Amino acid sequence: MDLNAIRILGLDPGLRRTGWGVIDVTGSRLAFVACGTILPPEQAPMGERLAHLHRELLGVIERFSPQEAAVEETFVNMNPSSTLKLGQARGVVLLAPAQMGLPVAEYAALLVKKSVVGAGRAEKAQVRMMIGILLPKATPETEDASDALAVAVTHAHHRGAAARARAAL
């Protein structure tokens, strides 16, 4: 890792699948580091699934030592039960990096798509294609990992504004 680089962890939260992606940013240059998907056991009780997600996220943070984290804000759907469960997973995804002392920024899905593709209503396939262009060495095996890399790229582009917003609080 370049000593001037900032390492960013992007996260796409979900209870069934949580995508993560790590990039290094030096000035305006982006470099792929790693990505993956955390798959909590679907049949396990909720507490065990959340604990699994937490443990795996801490492992990713310890392994790759990011300096900042960014999380995609969740979409609220018509099913209150699904929204609540997603909110619980999102809480764990926000907690893990904060627990490790990382500043955590949040970005709306529309902003992530606009930052990466240029259109807020872009399809997941378009996001994945642009991630391949922006990070040629990236190898996301799932849409969740690709989305997490897109969140990291968005944070790389907006981190100055995010830092100013945190300082204003």
Swiss-Prot record:
Signal sequence interval, chain numbering: none
Alphabetized GO MF terms: crossover junction DNA endonuclease activity; DNA binding; magnesium ion binding
GO BP, sorted A to Z: DNA recombination; DNA repair
Presence of the UniProt keyword DNA-binding in the record: yes
Keyword Kinase: no
Enzyme class: hydrolase
Names of required cofactors: Mg(2+)
Keywords: Cytoplasm, DNA damage, DNA recombination, DNA repair, DNA-binding, Endonuclease, Hydrolase, Magnesium, Metal-binding, Nuclease
Gene3D superfamilies: Ribonuclease H-like superfamily/Ribonuclease H
GO terms for cellular component: cytoplasm; Holliday junction resolvase complex
Domain of life of the organism encoding this protein: Bacteria
EC number: 3.1.21.10
Comment on bound cofactor: Binds 2 Mg(2+) ion per subunit.
Reaction(s) catalysed (UniProt annotation): Endonucleolytic cleavage at a junction such as a reciprocal single-stranded crossover between two homologous DNA duplexes (Holliday junction)
Localization per Swiss-Prot or TrEMBL: Cytoplasm
SUPFAM superfamilies tied to this protein: Ribonuclease H-like
Residues annotated as binding Mg(2+) 2: 72
Binding positions (Mg(2+) 1): 12, 144
Active site: 12, 72, 144
Function: The RuvA-RuvB-RuvC complex processes Holliday junction (HJ) DNA during genetic recombination and DNA repair. Endonuclease that resolves HJ intermediates. Cleaves cruciform DNA by making single-stranded nicks across the HJ at symmetrical positions within the homologous arms, yielding a 5'-phosphate and a 3'-hydroxyl group; requires a central core of homology in the junction. The consensus cleavage sequence is 5'-(A/T)TT(C/G)-3'. Cleavage occurs on the 3'-side of the TT dinucleotide at the point of strand exchange.
NCBIfam families: ruvC
Subunit-structure text: Homodimer which binds Holliday junction (HJ) DNA. The HJ becomes 2-fold symmetrical on binding to RuvC with unstacked arms; it has a different conformation from HJ DNA in complex with RuvA. In the full resolvosome a probable DNA-RuvA(4)-RuvB(12)-RuvC(2) complex forms which resolves the HJ.
Family classification: Belongs to the RuvC family.
HAMAP family: RuvC
Protein name according to UniProt: Crossover junction endodeoxyribonuclease RuvC
Lineage start: Bacteria, Pseudomonadati, Pseudomonadota, Alphaproteobacteria, Hyphomicrobiales
